[in-house]
């Protein structure tokens, strides 16, 4: 590719999916430029690596580019897209560029409605501990690496495979993981769940004859597609028919202790430095792949015991002082679908038993709020205190009765928790300050702008 394409421009370079690919391309020696609406830590990092970053979108930003990379979040009337089309510069979907990177190495693609980022991070960490030095592209910041991407010298590239826009069908990896299949982003599939499941089946058909599908058989929808997967399968989970199976599972001091039973290898005792049964499942996928690639057991154990987590995936900010005296424990999480939220809340209950759980949640997308409304009411009613913001639109138009106030009213009617509604995330710190107590566990949660709140809470109040 490099002898033809030397300069690659990214529209929306600061996004989680785009920035990782851009960083790998910079490190491969390409000239990389990009634009975004505002500066953030990601754009600053890319600029320090040598990328040319423009704030704001303008046709002049693509000057000299041989290709322009876009995500599905970029509108077709974006001035840089219009300029590229006018100049006949190839406009490349993000997933197609990721597929191009995968052609350079052997791809390990992690798919599923929930758990992709954590599972991708665990796989990359275990392979790195085993000396395989993988390249990785992750949808969140791997805390141990300080970045969401890294160019390794090894044979493998580990990356998330995104089903939200069906773009994972552009990838042709040699190993695939499917963590679960759930009803999300249903507009992509015409609100037809059968079409969504068929897309995951088609994803497995992208594997070569020597490829492997690593599938979580705890998920009923994954189990349903098993008969239609024609490539070799490794089943993982808690289920009795799993080939890589967790037994003797215990939650202790925010960590998960378990034994991984393996069909073709001895059992291995694991201490996972993450809470929650869902993270045990994610770790089993990493153990399955590492075992297949002959990573030593001691390296697997060390990687999982030392795993420092991923930014905004049950990210702990430590103890934050309370104005009235004492302190609370602050955790931040990206969860924005009821299934993910329930798993995170369960993990928090396991990690902090007998603590009062306070949640500040920003719903993400009006369509998701509408489609999962009753499930949101149920899961949000399981916490002890709740602050709820208006929906983060992600570019969507408002939908009647699918806004934050409607959700607040429904939760209040359910009668299990009294929600506090605020219009914006800027009001969240004060709202929390009015209800938080010494000894509480506070979780900020959502995929939108609420991600800025924990840093403000910790910075303003001081982290111990």
Swiss-Prot record:
Belongs to the MurCDEF family. The keyword Protein biosynthesis does not apply. It comes from Paraburkholderia phymatum (strain DSM 17167 / CIP 108236 / LMG 21445 / STM815) (Burkholderia phymatum). InterPro entries: Mur-like_cat_sf (IPR036565), Mur_ligase_C (IPR004101), Mur_ligase_C_dom_sf (IPR036615), Mur_ligase_cen (IPR013221), Mur_ligase_N (IPR000713), MurCDEF_pg_biosynth (IPR050061), UDP-N-AcMur_Ala_ligase_MurC (IPR005758). It holds the Pfam family Mur_ligase_M. Its EC number is 6.3.2.8. The keyword Cytoplasm applies. SUPFAM superfamilies: MurCD N-terminal domain, MurD-like peptide ligases, catalytic domain, MurD-like peptide ligases, peptide-binding domain. This is UDP-N-acetylmuramate--L-alanine ligase. It is an enzyme of class 6 (ligase). Cell wall formation. The gene is murC. Pathway: Cell wall biogenesis; peptidoglycan biosynthesis.
């Amino acid at each position: 590719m490099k002898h033809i394409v030397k300069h690659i421009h990214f529209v929306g370079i600061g996004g989680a999916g785009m920035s990782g690919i851009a960083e790998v391309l910079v490190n491969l020696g390409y000239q990389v430029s990009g634009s975004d609406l505002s500066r953030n830590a990601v754009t600053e990092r890319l600029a320090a690596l040598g990328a040319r970053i423009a704030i704001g979108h303008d046709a002049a930003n693509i000057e000299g580019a041989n290709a322009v990379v876009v995500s599905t979040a970029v509108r077709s009337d974006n001035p840089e897209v219009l300029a590229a089309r006018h100049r006949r510069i190839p406009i490349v979907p993000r997933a197609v560029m990721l597929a191009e990177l995968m052609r350079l190495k052997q791809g390990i693609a992690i798919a599923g409605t929930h758990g992709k980022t954590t599972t991708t991070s665990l796989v990359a960490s275990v392979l790195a501990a085993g000396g395989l030095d993988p390249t990785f592209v992750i949808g969140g910041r791997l805390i141990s690496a300080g970045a969401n991407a890294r160019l390794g010298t090894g044979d493998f590239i580990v990356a998330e495979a995104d089903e939200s826009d069906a773009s994972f069908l552009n990838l042709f990896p040699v190993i695939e993981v499917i963590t679960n299949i759930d009803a999300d982003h249903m507009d992509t599939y015409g609100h037809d769940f059968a079409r969504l499941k068929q897309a995951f089946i088609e994803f497995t058909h992208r594997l070569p004859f020597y490829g492997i599908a690593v599938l979580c058989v705890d998920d009923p929808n994954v189990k349903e597609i098993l008969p239609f997967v024609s490539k070799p399968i490794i089943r993982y989970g808690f289920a009795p028919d799993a080939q890589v199976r967790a037994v003797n599972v215990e939650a202790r001091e925010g960590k998960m202790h378990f034994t991984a039973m393996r069909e073709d290898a001895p059992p291995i005792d694991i201490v996972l430095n993450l809470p929650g049964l869902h993270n045990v499942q994610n770790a089993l996928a990493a153990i399955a792949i590492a075992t297949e690639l002959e990573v030593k057991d001691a390296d697997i154990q060390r990687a999982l015991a030392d795993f420092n987590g991923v930014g905004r995936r049950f990210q702990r900010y430590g103890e934050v002082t309370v104005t009235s005296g004492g302190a609370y424990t602050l955790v931040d999480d990206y969860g924005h679908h009821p299934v993910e939220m329930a798993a995170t809340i369960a993990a928090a209950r396991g990690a902090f038993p007998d603590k009062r759980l306070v949640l500040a949640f920003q719903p993400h997308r009006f369509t998701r709020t509408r489609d999962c409304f009753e499930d949101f009411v149920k899961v949000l009613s399981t916490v002890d205190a709740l602050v709820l913001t208006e929906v983060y639109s992600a570019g969507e138009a408002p939908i009647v009765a699918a806004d934050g106030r409607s959700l607040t009213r429904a939760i209040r009617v359910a009668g299990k928790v009294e929600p506090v509604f605020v219009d914006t995330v800027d009001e969240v710190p004060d709202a929390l300050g009015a209800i938080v107590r010494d000894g509480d566990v506070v979780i900020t949660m959502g995929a939108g702008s609420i991600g800025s709140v924990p840093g403000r809470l910790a910075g303003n109040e001081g982290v111990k």
